[in-house]
Amino acid sequence: MSEKFVELRKEFLTKLYKSTPSEQTSRSEKETWLEEKSKYLGEMTRELNEVQDQIAPYDRRVCMEQLVDLTRRLQQIRHDILPRQPFRFQRALHVKSSQKPVKNITVNAEAPEVYFENDTLYLANLKNQNIGDNVIPYPNNKAVKVSAKSLRSCNISISNCSSVNLHNATKCNFTFPTIQGSIHLSDINDSTICVSCHQFRLHHSTNLRVHLRCKTSPVIEESKEISFSYKDEHPILDFTWARSDPSPHFRITSDLFDA
């Protein structure tokens, strides 16, 4: 087994539990801390890619299982320190006691959001929207972060990104020609993704068409029916499939986007 991989794992575990942000830490600092730890996992993945032909199949499997374990630990910490916001109505509904009760009242608690703040484009609760570079007040040569959630039937195309985080999207088209860092996707379904990035992470997603260029091994977990158009040298890793035979959860099709 790679000695460097072993040392990286020890160092990662030490940093993971000795420097975990406290409840008083700001949300932005927590997000930065999580992004740094995710990059560290990427370094471990690169190390495994470089030595995979030099180590025994059993050792490679053990290393992959350890990567899966570390990823799950980080996900659990992410859940603990950045829990989802509790559901709240935006405005209270007051009914006088003399009034008759009104049936079938629907209150829209999730207002659409499109705004730019601290070099980050925030998108949330959108349906049938087209979002492009025109919403960014910077010239195209400056990279921005993208954070998006709860999208339905949207087309999102941003030319230059430093990182992208997508959560909970259905029947969308995403295009990110340049991502300097990582793209993290979770709960994405029935969508198309075109992306060039340094690091690709996909979790809990189904039925995707992915046109991908990536400088490190793409990683998927708890996902299925993923079709990749992918020709880079780094193998796609499925952290939920530790067997030696190919994962049934994804396929590589070179002509995926020719139709």
Swiss-Prot record:
Subcellular location: Cytoplasm, Cytoskeleton
Domain of life where this protein originates: Eukaryota
Coiled coil feature spans: none
Domain C-CAP/cofactor C-like per the UniProt entry, residue ranges: 112-241
Gene Ontology molecular functions: GTPase activator activity
GO cellular component: cytoplasm; microtubule; tubulin folding cofactor complex
Record keywords, A-Z: Chaperone, Cytoplasm, Cytoskeleton, Microtubule
GO biological process: post-chaperonin tubulin folding pathway; protein folding; tubulin complex assembly
Function, in words: Tubulin-folding protein; involved in the final step of the tubulin folding pathway.
Family: Belongs to the TBCC family.
Protein's name in the database: Tubulin-specific chaperone C
